[in-house]
Amino acid sequence: MKISANSIRTGNILVYNNDLWVVSKTPEHTQPGKGGAYVQVEMKNLKTGTKRNERFSSSDYLEKAELEQKDYQFLYFEGDDLVLMDTKHFEQINVPKEILEEKLPFLTENMIVKVEFYNEKPLNIELPPTVILEINETDPVIKGATATASYKPAILENGIKVKVPQYLEVGEKIVVKTDDMTYVERAK
């Protein structure tokens, strides 16, 4: 499917120079005083892992990879692979851990994830937008901290460090965004 350079978004997988590239950073749209508008795109090759910056004219069209998306349940780790089970047909597949990169700590047992396939090969795993995690370490509560909008560092059960409001304590569960690893709210 062809898309305009202006329509490129973070996470899009493009077919460029006969390779698959994932857009790794929000594209910058620039309108210089002289010359035509262009879009600066940072992307990563899915095969080699190399990063590249490309400049496309706003009038350019690029090929967006047609991906098939299926729901899978995470079962367990097996060496350097994740073992996932299709939620409809109960078939199990092994997917390399490196597909998730820095989001791997958010993966919990029995979590439902979306696996994106290109030509029947798993390319990407999409986690739920938020997860509930427990605070393992943080500074003690300071009296009167509910009135301030300041944050303190906290280490969660999965080892991730996030900034949380001053009033939260060790043992409390919080909601965290998986895309940028930020605090959302106290879990209900």
From Swiss-Prot:
Molecular function GO labels: translation elongation factor activity
Pathway terms, separated by semicolons: Protein biosynthesis; polypeptide chain elongation
Tell me one Pfam family matched here.
Elong-fact-P_C
Its subcellular locations are:
Cytoplasm
Q: Which HAMAP family match?
A: EF_P
Tell me, what does this protein do in biology?
Involved in peptide bond synthesis. Stimulates efficient translation and peptide-bond synthesis on native or reconstituted 70S ribosomes in vitro. Probably functions indirectly by altering the affinity of the ribosome for aminoacyl-tRNA, thus increasing their reactivity as acceptors for peptidyl transferase.
PANTHER family for the chain: ELONGATION FACTOR P, TRANSLATION ELONGATION FACTOR KOW-LIKE DOMAIN-CONTAINING PROTEIN
Report the sequence similarity comment from the record.
Answer: Belongs to the elongation factor P family.
The protein's name in its UniProt record: Elongation factor P
Q: Which organism is it from?
A: Rickettsia felis (strain ATCC VR-1525 / URRWXCal2)
State the encoding gene.
Answer: efp
